[in-house]
Structure formats: C-alpha cells, structure tokens
Amino acid sequence: MAPRRTYQQEMAFLSRVSANQWIVNEGFVPNMRVPGTFYVNKHLETLMFEELQQHVDSGGHGGFLPAVKQLANVACLPGIVGKSIAMPDVHSGYGFCIGNVAAFDMSDPAAVVSPGGVGFDINCGVRVVRTNLMESDVADVKEKLAQALFDHIPVGVGSQGIIPTSAAGLESALEMGMDWSLREGYAWAEDKEHCEEYGRMLTADPNKVSARAKKRGLPQMGTLGAGNHYAEIQVVDEIFDAHAAEKMGVDAVGQVMVMIHSGSRGLGHQVATDALTEMERAMARDGIETNDRQLACARINSTEGQNYLSAMSCAANYAWVNRSSMTFLCRQAFAKMFDSTPDDLDMHVVYDVSHNIAKIEEHMVDGKLKTLLVHRKGSTRAFPPHHPLIPVDYQYTGQPVMIGGTMGTCSYILTGTQKGMDETFGSTCHGAGRARSRNNSRNKLDYAEVLENLKTKGISIRVASPKLVMEEAPESYKDVTEVVNTCHDAGISKKAVKLRPIAVVKG
C-alpha cells in the first residue's frame, strides 16, 4: 500500500488557474480519467483546504471524505467527459460532494449513472413567485401573513399533505408532473412555461417506483418537509441587471416575492435507496470498480441504469407537483389576506429550477456536439441566452437561476451565461452550502438565540421543529453572497436580483 501523503504533498496536485478557479490534476487519487476543477474565491478556498488538512491529520478516518477527494473520485467513473466540476457552495456529501457537476457520454457503452450524483432528495429545487405588492403593503400584516402561510402549507418532518389524492392519483402525478397539477386545478398553464423541463420528465415510469416509495410519497404530497426546506416571503433588495429583472416581472426595489424550496420528500429518498441496492449488484456483475463504495453506479444502458432514470424522473415529477401544490396554497393565503385574487396580485411563477437531478442534454465536448447525461447535485442548470430549452421570455437574458440563501440571509436570482455553457455544462451554484455539519451545529448553537437574531433583523418566523433551527442557522452555512459573487466573477452565471427575507416558514 502506498505511504500516506502529507498535506503539502496533497496540495502539490492542486493548481490555481484564476482568482476563482482551481484544477485538481490527475494523480490526486488513483485512476482519474479527467481532471477535476472547483470554483472558489480566496475566502471560500480556506474551508476546502481546512477539510483536506483535517482529513490528512486524522489519518483518513472520520465521516465523509473531504469534498476535493470526492470530486476527484468522481473523475474516475467510466464515461465521464470534460472535468469533474465543483461549485463554490461545495461540501462533502454521499459519494459525490454537494455542488458537483459531472457529465457522462451517452454514446460510450461503459458510461454510468450514479444515484449519489443526484442525491437522496431528488429534484430538490427552488421556485420564485412574484407579486405586485410592495414591502409597505405587507409591513403591518407580516406576522399574520407568516402565520397564514404556516397554516396553509403542511410543514415539518412527518407532515402530511392536504391536497387530496388517491393511490391512482399519485401514479398519475408521478407520470405527469405539473400536467397533473394543471389538470387537477392546482397550477396555471403559464406556470409550466416557467419551469425547468416544463415541470414534467417524459422518461418517468411509475412502474419503476417501489411500493414502499409510493407508500412514503402518498401522504406527503404538497408538503414542505423539514431540514433546509422553507417558504419565504422576500422583498427585492437590489437589482443588478434591470433588463433581466424587467423580463422576470421585477419592477422595483421593495417588491414582494415568495420563494419555495422543497423536494421529493420520502419518495425521492426511497427511490435513491432502492437504486443503490440494485446498483451494487450490477457493479459486481459488470465488473465496475470505483474508489469509494458510495459511488455505486450502473451502466446508463443497463436495466438498472434505465430503471433508476425512470424512477428518478417520477420523483422529479413528484417534486414539481409538490412545489405547484405549495404555490397554490401560497396564492390562496395571499388572496385571503389581501382580500383579492392571485391573478390580481400578479402571483406568477418567475421560474422553477432543480438542483438535484440527472438530465440528458447536448453539449460541446472537445469541439464536438455530444449527448450527455449531466448529473447535478447541489448545482443548478444555468442555460445561456438563445438556448432552445428556455422560455421565450428569457431568450435574451438567459435562464433565471434561483439561489436560496440560508434562514435569515439574502437570496439571489442569477442568469445563465455562454461561458457557463462552455465551462460547466451550463451549471452554477445552488445556495450557500454548509460550512459546519448538522451535528456540529446542534452542539454549538442555541436555538433561542438563533430565533432571537432573526427577530432583531425584523424577520417573522414560524418553525414546525424548533430544535432543527440550529442546523439551518446562518452560522452553519457559507456566505451566500461570497458564493454568488464567485460564480459571477468567474463568468459562469450573472447576478440579476438580490432578495431579502421578511418572513420565513420552516419545517
């Protein structure tokens, strides 16, 4: 066995190529097929390197591998092209680090799909709904509005949905995504236009979703869940790109918006768990070897690979139904509070993006157009202006990208760029990214103090599980502004609008 490398020896494989980008050179871990790269500025890089230093000092023992090692291990997977890429909000996760983008060549029979490259919360994502209200309109009723949202949207760990459906209804929702929401009257036709994939993955096959996953999914439809999921009332704090903002219906600083961050709940988790078990068997059968057993994968064109992609598509559709149901409930709450209609309040969806998903896309690789399976885990699609897969309204601005901050910090709307398309398979960051583990947060932070800090910022908060608040406190995360600025300065996405929270509803 090769002797363990010192921290300095490990760092010799990493090279800075710009103020915001590093390359992980081949040899950092065995069997790398392509280099790795990560986007971090001076401040964010210290977190990456501290994690690596701790790993070396501990003799390689402890929890997850450091993110930079995970990034390099992904670069060893069969069929990977370009680079294994990490965004500035990177932190270690299961198999793939959070913030990882990896693309696999669909024409390569050896190319793989890995559930660890999507994550357990399939199609966890963010939707922003605009209104024509201003901060002054909601100032006096902010507490009531927070309570109304809390009352309307089922939140918390075991929360159950109030959108009535049956087992047959769930099957339809898994197959149809937002088309189901539209048919059942929970969405507007134009909502679909402003949603990635138009809110429906056509590769979904409910027969590939286990009975256990469906059993977990049925009672949770239209629920927010816990952890870092939230519904937030925000106001526009700053406009960086007036043209893009205008296209999004963002007219002025102080305008009220609603941000919904949620995913596929227990159903998505079960789909991932089921697939990992199947894929371990497939790896043994097909002789696929990885550096880390958490990188369980299967050939894209194998039965297991296709089964996973069909089931993952169902979980993605379920998450879009969830966000659509919560949009419906938000619209109801606002309409009731302001004695109006959602239409008169101009409560249109600005855009809805996923940040845990694998999708078949076309990209240029080494000067050739290739069909790739792009895994994005804790990373958001950010297609450039004139891309055929983005709505007509955004053809001149690029695709809107919703970046949720942490509880009590600002959020952003960005737009996609051509440079991002060329360098990161049209991807950018997804949020702030954890700076300390959930366990560490629970041990070091006091929830009463966290809630008090939010109140002093003038933020109304409703929380279903107060003890979980410490895990999601701003102190547990990187600074979202640093993350967004790194992407902006690197040119892989562009800042359009900054949003500030005035009320938070959390699970």
From Swiss-Prot:
**Similarity comment: family membership:** Belongs to the RtcB family.
**Subunit field text:** Catalytic component of the tRNA-splicing ligase complex.
- Recite the UniProt keywords alphabetically: GTP-binding, Ligase, Manganese, Metal-binding, Nucleotide-binding, tRNA processing
Q: State where Mn(2+) 1 binds.
A: D121, C124, H229
Q: What does this protein do?
A: Catalytic subunit of the tRNA-splicing ligase complex that acts by directly joining spliced tRNA halves to mature-sized tRNAs by incorporating the precursor-derived splice junction phosphate into the mature tRNA as a canonical 3',5'-phosphodiester. May act as an RNA ligase with broad substrate specificity, and may function toward other RNAs.
Cofactor(s) the protein requires to work: Mn(2+)
Record text on cofactor binding = Binds 2 manganese ions per subunit.
Which residues are Mn(2+) 2-binding? C124, H261, H355
GO biological process assignments: tRNA splicing, via endonucleolytic cleavage and ligation
Task: Please report the name of this protein according to its UniProt entry.
Answer: RNA-splicing ligase RtcB homolog
- Pfam families to which the protein is assigned, alphabetical: RtcB
Q: Could you tell me the EC number(s) of this protein?
A: 6.5.1.8
Q: Which cellular component, as a GO term, is one annotated location?
A: tRNA-splicing ligase complex
The record's listing under InterPro entries reads: RtcB (IPR001233), RtcB-like_sf (IPR036025), RtcB_euk (IPR027513)
One Gene Ontology MF term: RNA ligase (ATP) activity
* Miscellaneous comment text of the record: Ligation probably proceeds through 3 nucleotidyl transfer steps, with 2',3'-cyclic phosphate termini being hydrolyzed to 3'-P termini in a step that precedes 3'-P activation with GMP. In the first nucleotidyl transfer step, RTCB reacts with GTP to form a covalent RTCB-histidine-GMP intermediate with release of PPi; in the second step, the GMP moiety is transferred to the RNA 3'-P; in the third step, the 5'-OH from the opposite RNA strand attacks the activated 3'-P to form a 3',5'-phosphodiester bond and release GMP.
Recorded catalytic activity of this chain's protein: a 3'-end 3'-phospho-ribonucleotide-RNA + a 5'-end dephospho-ribonucleoside-RNA + GTP = a ribonucleotidyl-ribonucleotide-RNA + GMP + diphosphate; a 3'-end 2',3'-cyclophospho-ribonucleotide-RNA + a 5'-end dephospho-ribonucleoside-RNA + GTP + H2O = a ribonucleotidyl-ribonucleotide-RNA + GMP + diphosphate + H(+)
Positions contributing to GMP binding: 228-232, 355-356, 404-407, 411, 430-433, 506
Please list the residues that make up the active site. H430 (gmp-histidine intermediate)
Domain of life (superkingdom) = Eukaryota
